[in-house]
């Protein structure tokens, strides 16, 4: 079974952080939080899930902050989430299955990112994002805004999805 470090960058996310972390607490092996200057209860909430909380001065560059978060990871793979992302129950199960069966030669796992919903909560817009990235494989985030990792090596398209929920359901 592979191990996974959750690597997050946060700032003033007290309204959504707990929901996010609760949805993945039993799935990941390590939680890394890089705080870029919160002035609310974000840090306090994060301490209920991890003691690996690092300050990083904001540099107008999301990739710099994400790379900082990944630099603290010690597990086989790094996973990123934004504080307003969640794993739904069916995706939690699919993720655990992936952890048990993933071929360790896979460098990047792409996962659907559900970001648009109709009035009934059904997904209306989804696209694949690099979600699990092999740790220390030489890949890094690029782009000050709309940052990405260019997949290198073996890429797997997964069954688990990440759901973007701006506010509490």
What residues fall within each predicted segment?
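Residues at the starts of beta-strands that form the adenosine-phosphate
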Residues: 3, 29-30
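N-proximal low-complexity "stem/linker" segments adjacent to membrane-targeting elements
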Residues: 1-23
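Catalytic-site signature of metal-activated, phosphate-bearing donor transferases
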Residues: 3, 64-70, 76, 87-169
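Conserved donor nucleotide-binding strand/loop of the catalytic core
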Residues: 44-72
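A conserved acidic beta->alpha catalytic loop
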Residues: 23, 27, 35-47, 58, ...
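Conserved beta-strand positions in the Rossmann-like core of class I SAM-dependent methyltransferases
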Residues: 32-35, 54
